[in-house]
Amino acid sequence: MFNSPIFENKSMSFKNKFTANTQLKLSPFFERTSKLNESQEWRRWSGYLSATNYELTHENEYFAIRTKAALLDISPLKKYLIDGPDASNLLDSLVTRNIQICKIGQVMYTPWCDENGKVIDDGTVQRLSENKYRITSAEPNLDWINHIATGMNVSILDDSETTAALALQGPNSREILNSISGTSLNDLKFFYMIDTNFNGTQVSISRTGYTGDLGYEIWINQEDALVIWDLLLDKGKSYGITPTGLHALDISRIEAGLILLDVDYVSSRHAIIESRKSSPFELGLGWAVKMNKNDFIGKNAL
């Protein structure tokens, strides 16, 4: 597959590099990641082609996470914008965390369950404004959210392709971002986010990640993706910034005790036998289940 013209023609728009027969999509960063990927090892992630390693082995990328700064393309995450007067109530009915106490600019990690209290998926909820949120997830949830939202005063937009995302993880990540951000990140708390700009380009930054180390996730308009990638690599050179693939990320998230759908658990939507389904308590996520909040899907079973 990698001898295909889609990898040879670097001038093609990332939207057009696959035909209807290829089944895979390309990230807004692919024009950069494909040239940097010495190993040409790739994985499928939510229908996208994602780098496994950039170098022939993962060691340097792993140690960049732990000792320097690692730059990861996380654009394949599913991203949905929920906006409107009933947005808080909708999300509160979907997830196990108490969304009513989520502050503007705060991010909450949460699972969500089926009626039997078995986990469908997990992800984050970002409160962008009074009545506007972004929810991220590993697999598609748009139809399910739309179904639950029936009759509510909300709009739901699939933001997965229009918003690109990068993770900058590691002990040097804050210094790199402070060197280009219009707003200092020194006071940004864990699981909070801010809007800022990099040399005039608008971005949002959340102090979140999947490594257990100091790190941030950067949310970018798709059309600005390459500008931001180039800027980060340029400003991060002296800090040891390293493009990093999913292999090193896997090791880091295991060390941090963070779970992954289809590896550590099976979505209750897809489990063929009942014993493959898991409750949040069985996954070590009991801390994220708030039984004293308003009713939510699966609460009675839990």
Question: Model-predicted segments: where are they?
Answer:
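Acidic, proline/glycine-enriched N-terminal capping motif
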Residues: 2-113, 118, 247
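Generic hydrophobic, aliphatic-rich segments that mediate packing or membrane embedding
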Residues: 61, 76, 86-91, 108, ...
